[in-house]
């Protein structure tokens, strides 16, 4: 049960119910309930949900991403070699989804954006070049 978060929950649901794709960044101090807010608001609506690994290497982060894809029902042919390939796999999962609206939740992004990982570059390419164009895609952080 969410207490004192009605306004934030309403804003998230407004983004979800919109007719266009939305990129929502939720940020704030650690341990204040951001992840809980997202999970309670979107309970069974996630097309994909992933949390970065604290102190994980690039290879460990990519392996975790593959594991999250598989948990969402995508059969990954291999662990992606880089973030561009990882986001291509996410695109395929989204294409395969029969849900009318897709919610992608990426938690702990700073842990994935390690030096020289190019995570943000791949995320920008995914969002600007593909995800923002559709009306059935939502991404939450």
Language-model segments: which ranges?
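Phosphate-binding site recognition
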Residues: 1-141
